């Protein structure tokens, strides 16, 4: 919720940003996930202290931070330690995506 509010404030503060977002302040379903992916790469680059591909890959299991979608950590082989999925359904009446809930597995 805080992420959505922050993005909407950022979009509405500048007419050009709002126009580039399709003329509205809707937040796409994958925005938060994309943000966390970007921040994950940034954290791996910082830990690696290099842009060398092998060094960044080797740093991935050590990435650990609080993302907007929850804690971001990886196991020793580089798989994300996640047990949830963000599920939305297509609302064909209104033409929007409806958030169902965060689904957990395990």
Task: Tell me the role of every PLM-derived stretch.
Residues 1-106:
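Extracytosolic ligand-binding ectodomains
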